């Protein structure tokens, strides 16, 4: 055990001061100090309420609020001395307040515990973070809409199993990511509703004997409602878990998008070019231009998945109410929010700058018999059962593989080997343009539908 000792503000019950190493081990100020603004916001609302119900005088309230605002200025100017021996952001600010204004500072904590204080701080912080993240999602979606509108007629191969499947437009492909991000946006908006509940007033676990006005504090802090049960108020971290779950889904989407960008920029695909400002080089290979931004986003998804798993594991064995375990909720939550926000920002900056290589995309779509399904549909319209058509086209594809010809490159006589229902008009069906234009329905890849989807997307963003 360390022989160095330190004293805590709650030491009245103890016969010896806490061991210095234990003090450092249990302190959270190194990471929870980022809650300072929300801690001060909550304290100002709490002081205002205490004055309203007569626990503080108006003069005491004003002195406390002025002191808290001064402390916020000190922190933001980098002039605040964060002390590990004071454990956390709450006690550091309270101690500094008492240093500045004297005994009145000690009255601020009346009717409040650090248990409901920290639960309130985290909710205030996460509410703001969600708003920032929603803004980045919208910015990324705007970039996708702009690209999709420009590339409504650009044809590329669509894939299943990473094998050529059917022709699609690049605009249509980009709008798939728009749809995923719309769901991410909705999940986070929904999560924000449950985050925006105020635990302040729950005190340690059972509430307080003081005549507090929780509705007033709730209104001052912009919460939608108060937590309905004091035990749950200080114990609940569902909102943090729910956020990390929504963030995990969003990062999974960005990771899949990243994988496609990495593939598309490779020499083997060459579908797109990323501007140099989003890439790095190699220390040994002079020719390299590495897509580091999407690669890092793909890798960082694991951090957010880990945060979700960590929080679930953290909470699963805890009895009510607050336990010291919950100190470990902040770092994974902070990291998940930072990672998602930064990843979205990188993508929102990068996506509008992507340069598709139209000729290469088109050439790739011409390989792999991408219009085979169109030929089968053509035969269905001639009255044949689809399963028979499927087999007929399969034989035609095998012939194409053996002869090195795509379906559109075969002569009419060659095609008629497989069905006498095939006529000259089949070649309009077998073109890339014919294929994509034929899928002219809501959600289809036809250029007209891409443009219509862009209009709907713009209306959605404008409604937020």
UniProtKB/Swiss-Prot annotation:
Its GO CC terms?
cytosol
Give the UniProt subcellular location, in the record's own words: Cytoplasm
Primary location class = cytoplasm
Q: What is its EC number?
A: 4.3.2.1
PROSITE patterns, sorted: FUMARATE_LYASES
UniProt keyword terms in alphabetical order: Amino-acid biosynthesis, Arginine biosynthesis, Cytoplasm, Lyase
- GO BP term (any one): arginine biosynthetic process via ornithine
Which pathway is recorded for this entry? Amino-acid biosynthesis; L-arginine biosynthesis; L-arginine from L-ornithine and carbamoyl phosphate: step 3/3
Q: Which InterPro entries match?
A: Arg_succ_lyase_C, Argininosuccinate_lyase, Fumarase/histidase_N, Fumarate_lyase_CS, Fumarate_lyase_fam, Fumarate_lyase_N, L-Aspartase-like
Looking up Pfam families in the UniProt record yields: ASL_C2, Lyase_1
Superkingdom of origin organism? Bacteria
Carries keyword Phosphoprotein?
no
GO MF, any single term: argininosuccinate lyase activity
UniProt record similarity statement: Belongs to the lyase 1 family. Argininosuccinate lyase subfamily.
NCBIfam families annotated for this entry?
A: argH (TIGR00838)
Q: What is this protein called?
A: Argininosuccinate lyase
Upper taxonomic lineage:
Bacteria, Pseudomonadati, Pseudomonadota, Gammaproteobacteria, Pseudomonadales
Query: What is the gene name?
Result: argH
